[in-house]
Amino acid sequence: MGRGRVEMKRIENKINRQVTFSKRRAGLLKKAHEVSILCDAEVSLIVFSHKGKLFEYSSESCMEKVLERYERYSYAEKQLKAPDSHVNAQTNWSMEYSRLKAKIELWERNQRHYLGEDLESISIKELQNLEQQLDTSLKHIRSRKNQLMH
């Protein structure tokens, strides 16, 4: 038997709030995965905890490709809605700023992953990709080192 509806307001007790976030985050990630499988949809989900920790899910393709696709789509939509050239210029700069900021955040996140940090939030497929990239990099480094030594 279900517990009934929960009133939608901030949970004041910090521990209860953290437990609820953890459980609901897991459920949300599971639902995103289910939608991607059942509906053959490309799904991406980004969640930041109140402490700023990133949790993400992306079906099939990597998050970077989905974000780039979203940016292109958003940019095209805004271009269609803003006929005034001054508004277009301001929108273009705003979009470029947002795009570059997102790219920097993505690079910083990738750098943390390469350093072995924040790995809890990425999928097994992304972990395998990361491992393959690191293996390839290590082979290049060893090859270059051997060239210099001989």
UniProtKB/Swiss-Prot annotation:
Record's keyword annotation contains Zinc: no
UniProt domain K-box: residue ranges: 90-150
Domain called MADS-box: residue spans: 1-61
Keywords, sorted A to Z: Activator, Coiled coil, Developmental protein, Differentiation, DNA-binding, Flowering, Nucleus, Transcription, Transcription regulation
Subcellular location as annotated: Nucleus
Any one cellular-component term (Gene Ontology): nucleus
Function of the protein: Probable transcription factor that promotes early floral meristem identity in synergy with APETALA1, FRUITFULL and LEAFY. Is required subsequently for the transition of an inflorescence meristem into a floral meristem. Seems to be partially redundant to the function of APETALA1.
Subunit structure: Homodimer capable of binding to CArG-box sequences.
Protein name: Truncated transcription factor CAULIFLOWER B
Organism: Brassica oleracea var. botrytis
